[in-house]
Amino acid sequence: MTGKTVTRADLAESVFRKVGLSRTESAELVETVIDEICNAIVRGETVKLSSFATFQVRDKNERIGRNPKTGEEVPISPRRVMTFKASNVLKTRILKSHVARKIKLKPLNPAP
């Protein structure tokens, strides 16, 4: 794993280089897309980006949890959570990248 985090600025820079919009327009485009996705999720809508992933809001019922330090039972309030489910296309790309990286990192003369 590279450990790199891709930021909004990185996405805007990529749009700038690949699409040809100005840097300002690229940043505005990225912000608009992110805002639209966030607004849809907040409204409880499912956001499906083909070949990428599905974002969905789920309701979780109240349940009993346990304090790990004391073992005491504690009620956990009902809440809404967002889930992210990667598409099969994305999962395949990740797997291929992982396999390619493993092959590339494999030592040429393994020790017995």
Curated annotation (Swiss-Prot):
One of its GO terms (biological process) is DNA recombination. GO terms for cellular component: cytosol. Keywords: DNA recombination, DNA-binding, Transcription, Transcription regulation, Translation regulation. One of its GO terms (molecular function) is DNA binding. The keyword DNA-binding applies. PANTHER family: DNA-BINDING PROTEIN HU (PTHR33175), INTEGRATION HOST FACTOR SUBUNIT ALPHA (PTHR33175:SF2). HAMAP family: IHF_alpha (MF_00380). Heterodimer of an alpha and a beta chain. This protein is one of the two subunits of integration host factor, a specific DNA-binding protein that functions in genetic recombination as well as in transcriptional and translational control. Belongs to the bacterial histone-like protein family. This is Integration host factor subunit alpha. It comes from Rhizobium johnstonii (strain DSM 114642 / LMG 32736 / 3841) (Rhizobium leguminosarum bv. viciae).
